[in-house]
Amino acid sequence: LFPILCSFGRYTVPVPVAQTIVARALLGSQFAMPNGMITLGAALRREADGAIVCSFTPYGRVADFVLAQDGDALLLLPCAAAQREASGVHGSLAANLRWPDERIATHVPGAGPLLPTFAAALHAALLSGAMTRVFEMTLKHCNDRIQFGKTLGKFQAVQHQLSVMAEHVAAASIAAEAAFRTDTTTPSLLAAAMAKSRTSEAAVLVASIAHALHGAIGIAEEYDLQLLTRRLHEWRIAHGSEAHWNALIGNSVLASDASIADFVRSV
């Protein structure tokens, strides 16, 4: 599954195919699957008038349903019944969704706590795929672009930036893939947390170096780099940035009697 999810990130698929795969896994074979695309709600809250709100929902503008955690249960909410408001950066498909009446939601017991784990692993894979392509585009640009009589890649400062970028892309990809190395159908919470933390941390650096080395062409609408880097920033904060997941990892370390090395080996 990891290579497939990476490819969705690499080619910036503009519909929640990856989220639908994960949502159907969470709903399980006992549930009658709805027709249409399902995205994962990053947060759910109830308002005083009984309305349900899912803020900054990835792909909320194009999804047919939202699957969100509600304590120990899941809620499946039809987007056609929601009030949608676009959110996120320019060109983002994220949206704030509000359902005036809770009765339209389908209650699915039991799998609620698994959604954040699946979402973290999913977005780590998407980030890994997108970052790999950003690095490849940047490397090609530096090898093709001639400035002051030689290609950009011949300048030592540029080589250093590319090396730093390659290091973070490789580390993020290893962390993301590790979240999928399991004998069970459910990813480990700690492995998913580490994957999302590492990929989110790398996303900012990779995007900034890519735009620094590309110059103005990097933000041109006709050039695909901006499609990828906008999604890097969006996926970085989706379902928790590195700060959120680092807190979970840190609390787990403090609660463990093992040394740091043994703790890492046990994940």
What are these model-predicted stretches?
Residues 1-11, 115-267:
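Alpha-helical interface subdomain recognition
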Residues 12-21, 25-136, 140, 263-267:
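FAD-binding core of flavoproteins
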